[in-house]
Amino acid sequence: MTEFQDPFLKSGEPVKFDKKYIDSTIRPGDIGIADQWAVKPVSDPFVGNLETPVNSGYFTKAFINNLPFYRSGISPNFRGLEVGAAFGYLLYGPFAMTGPLRNTDFALTAGLLSTIGAVHILTALFVLYTAPGKDPNVQPSDCTVENPPTDLFTRTGWTDFTSGFWLGGCGGAVFAWLLCGTLHLDTIMPIVKGVWAAG
């Protein structure tokens, strides 16, 4: 037994920690001791978020900071609208081309309905992210994203993002459905369906 351990073992009182080790922004009744002592990303140097030529290069920083999630000067609702439109538009193709009704006349409509269903599931997950009553986790600044959007990481901002995502996702799916349903693409669809059905 070392000299450091001996006083703690002999005394019957609980060990008191120094105030500098306790996060004073969190009320003790809100969370348990495990959350209070949890390792926080980026601020801890042992996490491994290091500045490398890949994550701190000009191209990477310009690309990441121009994504709708990190772009400055837009509202959370518009962020969600852009992200949702991309998801809805890109999810439509796999559902329409590889779905169980791909060789029928209802392939395009089944793809649309499947995509809208997937957007609804993703929207429900966004809603559940803040359902327990806590605000979303605020992303700290790092070497790639120096100014993360602070208005997005509030309950109101996340709710606006979620509603924009739902509207954009459904709109992107309908837009892709309209594009695939036009006459000039109708001749290409059997070729694409034949490629996927060959396997």
From Swiss-Prot:
An annotated GO cellular component: plasma membrane-derived thylakoid membrane
Gene3D superfamilies in UniProt: Photosystem I PsaL, reaction centre subunit XI (1.20.1240.10)
Highest rank taxon of the organism: Bacteria
The keyword Amino-acid biosynthesis appears for this protein: no
The UniProt record lists the keyword Transport: no
InterPro entries on file: PSI_PsaL, PSI_PsaL_sf, PSI_suXI
Bilayer topology annotation: Multi-pass membrane protein
Annotated TM spans: 81-101, 108-128, 165-185
Subcellular location, record wording: Cellular thylakoid membrane
Alphabetical keyword list: Membrane, Photosynthesis, Photosystem I, Thylakoid, Transmembrane, Transmembrane helix
GO BP: photosynthesis
Main location: membrane
UniProt similarity note: Belongs to the PsaL family.
HAMAP family assigned to the protein according to its UniProt record, in alphabetical order: PSI_PsaL (MF_00447)
PANTHER family reported in the protein's UniProt record: PHOTOSYSTEM I REACTION CENTER SUBUNIT XI, CHLOROPLASTIC (PTHR34803:SF2)
Protein name (Swiss-Prot/TrEMBL): Photosystem I reaction center subunit XI
Phylogenetic lineage: Bacteria, Bacillati, Cyanobacteriota, Cyanophyceae, Synechococcales
